[in-house]
Amino acid sequence: MSSFSDALWLGVQYAFFFVLAGVARSSFVFRLADRPLFWALLLGGLSGQWQPALSLGIVVELLWLDVIALGSVVPPFGTLAFLLLFPLSIIPGWSEAHQFLAPLMFAVFAAYGASYAERYQRVALNPLVDLVTAWFTSGRGCTPGQAVALGTVVRAAWQFSLYMLCYVALWLACDLLGEAIFLFEGQMGWPVLLAASMVGGILSLRTRRAYACLTGMFVAVCGFLAVTRLDMF
């Protein structure tokens, strides 16, 4: 793989994309930018890596089909999963489905972790409502504009930090494991991975039980793959 400095600089650029996706996620003006396929089309055009961009975008999009918000559970960050995976098509230049399988599992858990982090971040920002209320009643506290600005800065900071943490962890794992991270080499193509991603039909229910079902499935698959790899050695 390329040097750590090159990979880190690429990660910083994609962290800013993730921040922009977060802004779109919390607005009603341009919600399309919160969808993985939007970033697949945009970054595929900018980089020229159309094949991995569209393939990854469709896979991640199918994992979360719940375009319409239903239920009270904070939806996972599908854009985080895509923006973690796509740089691997640039550094180190992967393009085959089996190369992305193990990183995809990590990216899915990262997307769910980000949704839980967002929930706690929303709770942490709740005191801003009291400050705005105090400003209206007594003139003390902060104005609505100040509250929005502070909330935006806090949100951007935690999204940037979260992306860089996940990106560095994924890049180091890929760098240390090398080709050992490739699963089912020569046995899995993009059509198989696209079919497997149809599990998004479960996630579209957006209930805790559906999420627990997916988590259990991934744990079972990871356990099976771990045993298979051990048997190979």
Model-derived segments and their meaning:
Residues C222-F233:
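Juxtamembrane boundary at the C-terminal end of a transmembrane helix
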Residues F100-F182, L194-A196:
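Helix-loop-helix junctions within the multi-pass membrane cores of secondary transporters/permeases
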Residues S2-P75, T79-L80:
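Hydrophobic transmembrane alpha-helices
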Residues E179-V219:
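Alpha-helical transmembrane segments and their immediate juxtamembrane interface regions
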Residues L56-V60, A81-L83, A212-F224:
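Central hydrophobic cores of alpha-helical transmembrane segments
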Residues M1-V12, L43-L54, L88-F106, L176-E179, ...:
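Helix-coil boundary and interhelical linker segments in multi-pass alpha-helical membrane proteins
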Residues Y14-G22, L65-I68, L80-N126:
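Short helix-perturbing small/polar motifs within transmembrane alpha-helices
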Residues A21-V23, G44-G48, W64-V67, S89-G93, ...:
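Hydrophobic alpha-helical transmembrane segments
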